[in-house]
């Protein structure tokens, strides 16, 4: 589990997905854990919940989009970068109320801060998300 306290809805969703992948955590338990630790408004709590469950429910579709816009095989993408890309693609392709520039910028910030990615990987993610 990530020990850092999440500050945004997207961080809550990302931390939930990271915990599921890395620790085998159950989605509802991890989500409630991070929602309890975050000091979010009810609207942001709802967004975090929608993003986390939306990515979980649409992982295959998010990966399909990722394959269409990336030349890199999914198996070559670091797990946290992959999760962040799924989160960004979900926001871009499957939600209608999140502005594209916000989805791209916030996803790139998540990758930079929590995926331990170098600038080349950050640039790759930025390019893929802008193409979606």
Regions found by a protein language model. Name each.
Residues 1-132:
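Class I Rossmann-like S-adenosyl-L-methionine
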């Amino acid at each position: 589990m990530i020990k850092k306290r999440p500050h945004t809805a997207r961080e809550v969703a990302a931390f939930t997905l990271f915990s599921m992948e890395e620790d085998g955590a159950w989605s509802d338990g991890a989500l409630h854990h991070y929602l309890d630790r975050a000091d979010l408004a009810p609207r942001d709590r709802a967004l975090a919940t929608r993003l986390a469950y939306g990515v979980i429910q649409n992982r295959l579709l998010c990966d399909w989009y990722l394959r269409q816009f990336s030349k890199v095989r999914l198996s070559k993408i670091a797990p946290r970068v992959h999760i962040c890309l799924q989160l960004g693609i979900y926001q871009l392709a499957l939600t209608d109320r999140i502005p594209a520039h916000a989805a791209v910028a916030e996803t790139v910030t998540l990758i930079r801060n929590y995926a331990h990615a170098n600038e080349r990987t950050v640039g790759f993610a930025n390019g893929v998300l802008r193409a979606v």
